Amino acid sequence: MKPSFRNTSPSFRNRSKPYFRNRSKPYFRNRSKPSFRNTSKRFSPNQQSFRKRLSTIRPGEQIDYKNISLINRFISEQGKILSRRTNRLALKQQRLIARAVKQARILCLIPFLSLK
């Protein structure tokens, strides 16, 4: 025997009336609690803002697959491309470094894996 679903009450998703949110009430359920973000970090005018980190690439250096001395600074001992956080590079610089490393690997200027 198959169970009959006709006599059961409709679920909250399949109601006959569409559900409309009351716009006068706030969207969040409990506004009496202080929000986590506001209480954890307060900005004080005396506190110094974050320090701009110095780029590891000098202004005259070109990010290019032929510049092996530059590329080797951003590769681990195993031959992997180091993360942007480790390299302390901007996003655009990290993309250019990754592209240069991949081109240099294909042209056999640097090894794919270094077994040290």
From Swiss-Prot:
Keywords: Chloroplast, Plastid, Ribonucleoprotein, Ribosomal protein, RNA-binding, rRNA-binding. Residues 1-51 are annotated as: Disordered. Residues 1-13, 35-49 have a biased composition (Polar residues). Pfam families: Ribosomal_S18. One of its GO terms (cellular component) is mitochondrial small ribosomal subunit. GO terms for molecular function: small ribosomal subunit rRNA binding; structural constituent of ribosome. InterPro entries: Ribosomal_bS18, Ribosomal_bS18_sf. Its main location: plastid. SUPFAM superfamilies: Ribosomal protein S18 (SSF46911). This is Small ribosomal subunit protein bS18c. It comes from Cryptomeria japonica.
